[in-house]
Amino acid sequence: MPATRVSYSTGHRDQERPLPLTTSPATYTLETLGFDPSWQGAAIRTAFALNGALEDFTLARVSAVHRTRCELLTCERGELIKLSAPLRPVENDYGEEEYPVVGDWVLTQPIPGTGDDTQPAEHKPLAILPRRSYLTRPSATRESADQPVAANVDMLCIVEPCFPEPSIGRIERYTALAHASGVQVALILTKGDLVTAEQLAGYRDSLGSGMDAVLTVCTDHGYDPAPVAELVAGRTAVFLGRSGAGKSTLVNALLSPGVDPREDSSENRVQATSSVRDADGKGRHTTTSRQMIVLPSSEESGAGSSVGTVLIDTPGVRALAATSDSSAIDETFDDVSSYAAACRYSDCSHSSEPGCAVQQALADGALDPERFERYRRMMAESARLRLRSQEREYRQSNRAFTKANKAGRRTLMSLKGRAN
């Protein structure tokens, strides 16, 4: 079924594309976008903080963020409405200003003088509702701050291909990000038809440690997205993985169940896909920005919930730094941290101290040396990231102090001039 198209207020070519939906419920509601009753109180309190009632604003969810603009989805009279808004800092529940990210719920108002009978008015986001979760990933560069991925996510789905050989280190880093954000984590192994049954079983056993779910899908034939659809039903799930992992192919399959991904026409594809190189199985970047995609309602899929299923597709990640949250790393490597808790000294470095339970476990063969080495590297990288973040915060506060000091001196000189 072709993707549904709607009108929306924009004069920018980069936003003139199909709305990411293929199946239309009889009536759209905010629940279709992932809204549930617990959001109502937060929305009312946020509206009150803006000196208004909830009815004075439009409640919308951020579906995409571009360089200077963002796209919003809301519902009106049973229809799904796509709005355009300028990308500007918005006040959050802490009274601080920050940019909206994909998945945020925002209160907006129309900008006077925009819109007409054929398209909605352009909107201005005024406040961000308190986030339930906020997923970020550390930048691979030395100076950049953490990069936002999505907000209000229930589950992080790690999409990892079986060919070329899966990277357990990358999976562990994604898992730590999920734990740092307080969301569930699932592993979806794609291209399972490119390896033997024995290899596939081995991957499931070795890579599924600490996961809430492990699923396998075959990209080239017999593609059945039903297990994944059941996993994400009634949730907001973000797909993360490297280029060529099959994230966009999986999204298209979820939107067009029963359609062979190889035979799916371009007009039915919400997300573009690219082939991988035969030599090494590596892919190219196809998805270039984070995009929120609404699936058919959970009621239609048999989940028995009125809350809709929302997917967030993301560009492939080339390099992934460790999270700065050391407790999330401990949770990911729960076997290592359990041994570490039994060490004689609380500040044990697990190298040569007497009474080190970790070294004893390594000597006894109870702990995999390669896994411990990955844990050690992630912990060291996490410590460097925290130090870098502290240095960056110090520079920012120092610049703010210098700016305020200069402004104070200018004001003082101005007052002295008037006195003379």
Regions found by a protein language model. Give the residues of each.
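Walker A/P-loop
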Residues: 243, 248, 253
